[in-house]
Amino acid sequence: MRARAIRREPVRDRAQHFELGERGEALAIDQLERLGYHIVAANFSLPIGRNTRDAIVNAEIDVVAYDGPTLCFVEVKTRATAEFALPQTNVDLRKRRQIARAARGYRRMMGLAASPFRYDVVTVVAKPNDAHPRIELLKGFWTDEQLRKRNWQEQYWD
């Protein structure tokens, strides 16, 4: 059974960036499968807390897959052009923390807390009618250690 990005019915006057994002996710899944990843889930969403207005905050993991024995949480970033900024620049600290919290919840729900895991990013640069998009896999883009708060009680200035 192969997981696929959610395909929605065409909606009149739908923004192009939604279509580009969905196309990018589908291309990323195809690329990951070609590289030997076993896709487990696509567009996995989980509530991770509440904001200052007490509204529920959800985090989404674009792709959950296995690369051999390693569970991979993959964020897909799609752009029509990389002239202004690379797609991976939008995976900022806030986004990394959201994905890490959702990944922690996923691992807990599935009983995989002790399993090896990593965070990958797939970048897709594809114009709307481009037959040959540029797809790049960035393995181990960040770690949980990079998200931890620093312990300033140790002797910093010595």
Residue map of PLM features:
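Domain-level recognition of nuclease-like catalytic cores that cleave nucleotide substrates
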Residues: R108-D158
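Short connector loops at helix/strand junctions that flank enzyme active sites
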Residues: R34, I56-E60, P69-L71, L86, ...
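Acidic-basic catalytic patches of nuclease active cores, encompassing PD-(D/E)XK
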Residues: M1-T52
